[in-house]
From Swiss-Prot:
Gene this chain is encoded by: frmd8
Record field: transmembrane: none
SMART domains (alphabetical): B41
Record keywords: Cell membrane, Cytoplasm, Membrane
Boundaries of every FERM domain copy: 31-382
Task performed by this protein: Promotes the cell surface stability of rhomboid 5 homologs and prevents their degradation via the endolysosomal pathway. By acting on rhomboid 5 homologs, involved in ADAM17-mediated ligand shedding. Negatively regulates the Wnt/beta-catenin signaling pathway.
InterPro entries assigned to the protein according to its UniProt record, in alphabetical order: Band_41_domain, FERM/acyl-CoA-bd_prot_sf, FERM_2, FERM_central, FERM_domain, KRIT1/FRMD8, PH-like_dom_sf
Protein name: FERM domain-containing protein 8
GO BP annotations listed: anterior/posterior pattern specification; negative regulation of canonical Wnt signaling pathway; negative regulation of Wnt signaling pathway; regulation of canonical Wnt signaling pathway
Top-level taxon: Eukaryota
Naturally occurring in which organism (per UniProt): Danio rerio (Zebrafish)
CDD domains associated with the record: FERM_B-lobe
Segments of this protein annotated with the region Disordered: 1-23, 381-416, 451-471
Subcellular location: Cytoplasm, Cytosol; Cell membrane
C-alpha cells in the first residue's frame, strides 16, 4: 500500500523509543544480515550502513549474491514475515528501522496477546512481489529466477495456502518430482526417492498426512501412504512421458510448466491476510459464531478461503465487487472489511454484504484500492492513446457473451471443486434497492458502495511511518 512518511505510531511505545536509539549506531559499522528464501535457505550478507539502507538498495545486494539479473528487479520484493503478520516492503522502506517497529505494527494490525507480541520476531524474506503480473512470469528466461518462483509456489501449495483439487495437486507433485529427482529414474528408484524425501515434500500436508478419523485408523496410515506413493509415481511417469522430447525435459521447461499450472489457480500471487467471518446461524437457538478465514488479494481480485477446510468460500474479480472498511465505534467492536457483490436469494436478485472481521481491514482496503488503480493504468495503456480499443479489447458478440456466462455459471455450480465459491455457505446481509431492483454500481465497481460512488477511483493513503504493502 501507499502512504505518507509520517511518524508511526502517533504515540510511540516505550519499547520503540528504547530501540530506535540503536539505529543511528548501525549506520556506519558492518553488520551481518540473513535474507531468507522460500525454500528455507538464506543469503548471508555483511553490509555497512544497514541502518540507513532502503529495500531497493538492499535488493541489489541480494540479486548480486543470487546471480539474478537486474531485469528481474520488479519480480521480487522484501517481506517481513512472522506467524503473526506478513508485510511487503516498498522500495523506499528502511528494513532495519521497520524491524525495530515490529511490535508497534503487531499491536496495530493483530489481535495477538501482549506475551505473544513480546516474543515475536520477523524474518526478512526475498520473495515474489504481489504487484508483479503473472502474465510476465512465463516470459522470464533466467532459470534462477524461475526456480525462486517455483520454490515459493510449491511452498504455498504444500502449506495449503493455494487450495487445489486432488487431480491438480497430484500433477503439481509429479512435476516437483521431475524437477527435483530428475526424469530418468525407473519406478522402483523413483518410489525409493519419494520415500526418502517423504510425501509431504511433494503433496499438501492435509493430503499427505490425511485427515485422521475412525476409517483412516482402520485402514492404517501406512496403506494410505503406499497408495499415495503409487499414484504419485504413476502421475510422474505420465508427466515424464509427455515431456519426452529433449527440450521439454530441461529444468527450465519443467519449471515453466509448474508455474503455468499454478496460474490456473485464481489466487496465485496473492498477499494473504488473517480474518474471521460470521457462521450461518444454526439450530433452535440460531447460534452462529465465527469462522477463521484467509483473505487473498492480488492484481486479479479478492478471495476468501476457509483456513480449516482448505477451500474457497468466495472469489471476486474487482469488477464484481465494492468494498469499504470500518473502524470500531465502541470498545469491543471490530475492524471490518465490507465486501458487496451480486447474488440470489430464493430466486430473487439481491446485493450481498459480507463482513470480514480483522484488524488488518485497513491494510486490505488500501491494497484493493491500489490494485484497482494499477489495473486501471495498465488497461488504459493497452487501450491506445487515440481511444480505440486494441484487438484484445474488441467487443464480443451477444452469443459469445451468453456462452461465457453459461460456462461461468456451470463452473460456479461445480461445488465439488475447492476452487469454486461457496456463496451459499456464507452468512451475508442481503438487500434489494427499494425492494424492487438492484442499483448496479458502474463503471466496473472500482469504488466503494459506501463512500466512493461519487468519486473516481483514488488511492487513500494509510498514515504510518513506513507505508506498508501488506501480504
Amino acid at each position: 500500500m501507499e502512504g505518507d512518511d509520517g511518524d508511526f505510531p502517533p504515540e510511540p511505545s516505550e519499547h520503540s523509543l528504547s530501540q530506535r536509539g540503536s539505529v543511528a549506531s548501525s549506520v556506519t559499522r558492518a553488520q551481518d544480515l540473513l535474507v531468507y528464501l522460500a525454500n528455507d535457505s538464506a543469503v548471508h550478507l555483511t553490509l555497512e550502513g544497514l541502518g540507513c539502507m532502503n529495500a531497493q538498495e538492499l535488493g541489489r545486494s541480494v540479486r548480486e549474491a543470487l546471480n539474478i539479473p537486474n531485469s528481474a528487479a520488479d519480480v521480487f520484493a522484501f517481506w517481513f514475515c512472522s506467524p503473526l503478520l506478513e508485510l511487503q516492503l516498498k522500495p523506499k522502506h528502511l528494513p532495519y528501522k521497520l524491524c525495530r517497529q515490529w511490535q508497534d505494527l503487531l499491536y496495530r494490525f493483530t489481535e495477538a496477546p501482549t506475551e505473544d507480541i513480546s516474543l515475536d520476531e520477523p524474518s526478512l524474506l526475498f520473495k515474489r512481489s504481489v504487484f508483479y503480473p503473472r502474465a510476465k512470469e512465463l516470459q522470464i528466461e533466467d532459470e534462477g529466477v524461475l526456480r525462486l518462483l517455483y520454490d515459493e509456489a510449491k511452498m504455498n501449495i504444500l502449506e495449503g495456502r493455494y487450495p487445489c483439487d486432488p487431480e491438480h495437486w497430484l500433477t503439481l507433485g509429479a512435476l516437483s518430482c521431475a524437477i527435483e529427482l530428475g526424469t530418468e529414474l525407473d519406478d522402483q528408484a523413483l518410489t525409493a526417492a519419494i520415500r526418502e524425501k517423504k510425501l509431504s515434500s511433494f503433496l499438501p500436508a492435509h493430503a499427505a498426512l490425511g485427515g485422521g478419523g475412525f476409517l483412516s485408523t482402520l485402514r492404517g496410515r501406512g496403506g494410505r501412504n503406499a497408495e499415495m506413493e503409487q499414484n504419485l509415481v504413476k502421475e510422474c511417469r505420465s508427466v515424464c512421458s509427455s515431456a519426452a522430447s529433449g527440450s521439454s525435459q530441461e529444468p527450465i521447461a519443467l519449471l515453466r510448466q509448474y508455474l503455468r499450472s499454478c496460474h490456473n489457480l485464481p489466487y496465485y500471487g496473492c498477499a494473504f491476510f488473517a480474518g474471521e467471518i460470521d457462521k450461518p446461524a444454526q439450530g433452535l437457538l440460531h447460534r452462529g459464531g465465527r469462522k477463521a478465514v484467509s483473505v487473498g488479494i492480488s492484481l486479479e481480485g479478492v478471495y476468501v478461503m476457509d483456513v480449516k477446510e482448505k477451500h474457497v468460500l468466495l472469489g471476486l474479480k474487482f469488477t464484481e465487487l465494492s468494498w469499504d472498511h470500518s473502524y470500531p465505534e465502541t470498545e469491543g467492536d471490530s475492524h471490518i472489511l465490507w465486501l458487496e457483490f451480486d447474488g440470489e436469494e430464493a430466486g430473487t436478485p439481491v446485493n450481498k454484504l459480507l463482513k470480514i472481521y480483522s484488524k488488518q481491514a485497513e491494510l486490505m482496503s488500501g491494497l484493493i484500492e491500489f490494485c484497482v488503480e494499477l489495473r486501471s493504468v495498465s488497461e488504459s495503456a493497452a487501450t491506445g492513446t487515440d481511444g480505440e480499443v486494441t484487438p484484445s479489447h474488441e467487443p464480443t458478440s451477444p452469443e459469445t457473451n451468453n456462452k461465457t456466462r453459461e460456462r461461468r455459471q456451470g463452473k460456479l455450480r461445480r461445488q465439488n471443486s475447492v476452487v469454486c465459491s461457496r456463496v451459499h455457505s456464507l452468512s451475508t446481509i442481503n438487500y434489494v434497492d427499494d425492494g424492487k431492483e438492484i442499483k448496479r454500481l458502474k463503471p466496473k465497481r472500482a469504488a466503494s458502495f459506501f463512500t466512493r460512488q461519487a468519486q473516481p477511483p483514488t488511492y487513500s493513503a494509510v498514515q504510518v511511518t513506513e507505508s506498508l504493502e501488506q501480504g
